[in-house]
From Swiss-Prot:
It comes from Cochliobolus lunatus. This is Oxidoreductase clz16. It is an enzyme of class 1 (oxidoreductase). The keyword Heme does not apply. Coiled coil: none annotated. Belongs to the asaB hydroxylase/desaturase family. One of its GO terms (molecular function) is oxidoreductase activity.
Length: 293
């Protein structure tokens, strides 16, 4: 990872946030026909390059951190991640690499990797404007879980008995993402993190929008989820990314934390400086339950 003290570098781009509903009712999304009443609002943003910040963010203070990370697995395992053989290797070898990294960086007393996602984002900004909330390349800013849906997923991941034991044993917990490019330097759709430290008492209930889903086939693999949690706009947000991320770097960030101050809304964003010939962005993220004394 390269971090300098040079002049702050920024770029501009666009993300989408939730801006209420068309009918004033609870937000919904139907997976069967892609129907929704949610108003998706494009927001032009100025994004700060983490490499040129005067102070490097940390998971303990800001909820996110850019780190060096070298896996011993060849990239082929990630590029063909759905094959049973590669899936097994990722869940055994890569999960353990991520677990050790996360515990070393965050100081978590216990850590349990529970799922991974490999994404290929190749479309352009115009295509993203026509897409639904759940395609890989839609830059909708969100958190993976909130204070309602996190316990649901924790119980589904670890079993109700173990989940309750861990919740009673530790003072705080979270779901941390280890997000890393695969194969190429990121040239398109970099990951953007929202820093809300300047907003006192920021909370999931005050600055996030709940989107209720129906007919979601993913329930079979990830467990029940009461709703998705999408960001609403606030002019006080700071937007952070890392320029030219390589496969030997990773973002660590809390996609949920029991202390909302450390929960980080995130999403891909369209960088206005993206070149026409930019390569498809391939990335892998591993989600890990972490517990703190």
């Amino acid at each position: 990872m390269s971090t300098t003290t040079t002049t702050l570098h920024t770029t501009t781009g666009t993300v989408y946030v939730a801006d209420g509903t068309t009918d004033g009712k609870i937000g919904y999304y139907n997976h069967t026909d892609d129907s929704t009443n949610v108003i998706r609002k494009p927001i032009p943003i100025q994004v700060e390059d983490a490499r040129t910040l005067s102070k490097s963010p940390t998971t303990k203070e800001e909820g996110y951190q850019l780190v060096d990370f070298h896996t011993k697995l060849p990239e082929g395992h990630f590029l063909d991640s759905k094959s049973p053989e590669n899936k097994k290797v990722i869940e055994q070898v890569y999960f353990d690499e991520c677990r050790r990294l996360v515990q070393e960086v965050t100081g978590a007393a216990e850590a349990y990797p529970y799922v991974y996602r490999v994404r290929n984002q190749e479309q352009n900004a115009k295509a993203s404007n026509k897409s639904n909330f759940h395609t890989d390349f839609v830059p909708v800013v969100h958190v993976d879980r909130d204070d309602i849906t996190a316990p649901q997923r924790l119980r589904a991941s670890l079993g109700a008995e173990k989940a309750e034991m861990l919740l009673s044993k530790y003072k705080s917990y979270g779901s941390i993402n280890v997000w890393r490019p695969v194969k190429n330097v990121v040239q398109k759709w970099p990951l953007m993190l929202v820093d809300h430290k300047s907003i006192e008492n920021w909370d999931y209930s005050t600055h996030m929008f709940t989107l209720h889903s129906s007919n979601d086939e993913r329930v079979a693999t990830r467990g029940a989820k009461d709703h998705e949690t999408i960001l609403t706009h606030d002019k006080r947000y700071r937007y952070i990314y890392a320029s030219d991320m390589t496969p030997d770097e990773a973002w660590l960030f809390f996609a949920f934390h029991s202390d909302p101050a450390l929960g980080i809304p995130h999403g891909a964003f369209w960088d206005d400086s993206t070149k026409e010939e930019a390569l498809t962005r391939c990335s892998i993220e591993v989600r890990i339950w972490v517990f703190f004394d």
